[in-house]
From Swiss-Prot:
Gene name as annotated: ruvB
Quaternary structure annotation from Swiss-Prot or TrEMBL: Homohexamer. Forms an RuvA(8)-RuvB(12)-Holliday junction (HJ) complex. HJ DNA is sandwiched between 2 RuvA tetramers; dsDNA enters through RuvA and exits via RuvB. An RuvB hexamer assembles on each DNA strand where it exits the tetramer. Each RuvB hexamer is contacted by two RuvA subunits (via domain III) on 2 adjacent RuvB subunits; this complex drives branch migration. In the full resolvosome a probable DNA-RuvA(4)-RuvB(12)-RuvC(2) complex forms which resolves the HJ.
Superkingdom of origin organism: Bacteria
Location of this chain's protein in the cell: Cytoplasm
Cited InterPro entries: AAA+_ATPase, AAA_lid_4, DNA_helicase_Holl-junc_RuvB, P-loop_NTPase, RuvB-like_N, RuvB_C, WH-like_DNA-bd_sf, WH_DNA-bd_sf
Oxidoreductase listed as a keyword: no
PANTHER family per record: HOLLIDAY JUNCTION BRANCH MIGRATION COMPLEX SUBUNIT RUVB (PTHR42848:SF1), PTHR42848
Name under which the protein is recorded: Holliday junction branch migration complex subunit RuvB
Pfam families: AAA_lid_4, RuvB_C, RuvB_N
Region (Large ATPase domain (RuvB-L)): 4-190
Role this protein plays: The RuvA-RuvB-RuvC complex processes Holliday junction (HJ) DNA during genetic recombination and DNA repair, while the RuvA-RuvB complex plays an important role in the rescue of blocked DNA replication forks via replication fork reversal (RFR). RuvA specifically binds to HJ cruciform DNA, conferring on it an open structure. The RuvB hexamer acts as an ATP-dependent pump, pulling dsDNA into and through the RuvAB complex. RuvB forms 2 homohexamers on either side of HJ DNA bound by 1 or 2 RuvA tetramers; 4 subunits per hexamer contact DNA at a time.
Disulfide links within the chain: none
Length: 356
């Protein structure tokens, strides 16, 4: 049972898979072992120790919660955990588990020490989540048999297992669920050097010719996200084969990405549309996310989960109690004059001396 939600709008730099065909590509490019996994050194080192300890004790790994922006490798890590433990992986997602029976069917079919991966775990229904609590703590579930006065509760024992939960919104998890994870890991955006290594590895798997400068050019425009880097690589490879000699150089990558409307800092049309709306329609902000969503014709969740994290991390956008505000860096990026000292926007910036 494998299902994932898809964004309504397909973007070349979207951090979610756009199709089942693309998901198949991603699976082919995924690292299979921890020593192949690039980046996230702290998380990787921790998992290496915890997995080895669990294997030596011949017991299930403690439950793992992975959170962070989309496209950073949460699903990949879940597969690696199962492979390193030498056990089976069952994969599903929060929205798919609508009834308690759906989860019970999955849990009762797990073998000893298997891994159950639930993507978008923050979207579990309360009924399903209640069933999960005793399963995580005691490896038992309570199910109701019969109806009305004849109904009775039956306790079923489960094999020891590891739950790996993934979410882009850790804050939406209930405290009881969050507290039941023994291992909690946040995945961070990647730097250009790490992404360049990922691009070169993926190019080798795709039999694409690429030089280090070409890989770095793609990496710099990938928004710190491996999934986007691999997607851009495939499009640049197409361009290199048709418009050049097949070798991806910095010049070829630059031309291909310009054609795809991905600028030197990794912005595409939607990023620019969002920032320009704040600058021109709302005078630099502050503006509420609902007004912003209406102004650019995009879903609120897409703005919060896909567009904003990178813009905030790179310093182009600020969240304030009064709404979203464009930063000094945004004005400079679009070649606009910065607000004067009397502007209310300047008073909302985190840095008083931002113009320095």
């Amino acid at each position: 049972m494998i299902e994932t939600d898809k964004l309504a709008a397909e973007r070349i730099i979207a951090a979610t898979p756009a199709s089942s065909h693309e998901e198949a590509f991603e699976r082919a490019l995924r690292p299979r072992q921890l020593d192949e996994y690039v980046g996230q050194e702290k998380v990787r080192d921790q998992l290496e120790i915890f997995i080895e300890a669990a294997k030596r004790r011949a017991e299930a790994l403690d439950h793992v919660l992975l959170f962070g922006p989309p496209g950073l490798g949460k699903t990949t890590l879940a597969h690696i955990i199962a492979r390193e433990m030498g056990v089976n992986l069952r994969q599903t997602s929060g929205p798919v588990l609508e009834r308690a029976g759906d989860l019970a069917a999955l849990l009762t079919n797990l073998e000893a020490n298997d891994v159950l991966f639930i993507d978008e775990i923050h979207r579990l229904s309360p009924v399903v989540e209640e069933i999960l609590y005793p399963a995580l703590e005691d490896y038992q579930i309570d199910i109701m048999i019969g109806e009305g006065p004849a109904a009775r509760s039956v306790k079923l024992d489960l094999q020891p297992f590891t739950l790996v939960g993934a979410t882009t919104r850790a804050g939406m998890l209930t405290n009881p669920l969050r507290d039941r994870f023994g291992i909690v890991a946040r995945l961070e955006f990647y730097d250009a050097e790490q992404l360049s290594r990922i691009v070169r590895r993926s190019a080798a798997l795709l039999n694409a010719q690429i030089d280090p400068a070409g890989a770095l050019e793609i990496a710099k425009r990938s928004r710190g996200t491996p999934r986007i880097a691999n997607r851009l690589l495939r499009r640049v490879r197409d361009y290199a084969e048709v418009k050049a000699d097949g070798n991806i150089t910095a010049a070829v990558a630059d031309a291909a990405l310009a054609m795809l409307d991905v600028d030197p800092v990794g912005f595409d049309l939607m990023d620019r549309k969002l920032l320009e709306a704040i600058l021109h329609k709302f005078d630099g902000g502050p503006v509420g996310v609902d007004n912003l969503a209406a102004a650019i014709g995009e879903e609120r969740d897409t703005i919060e989960d896909v567009l904003e994290p990178y813009l905030i991390q790179q310093g182009f956008l600020q969240r304030t109690p009064r709404g979203r505000v464009a930063t000094l860096l945004t004005y400079r990026h679009f070649g606009l004059a910065t607000p004067d000292a009397a502007s209310p926007v300047r008073n909302l910036w985190d840095t008083p001396d931002a113009e320095r």
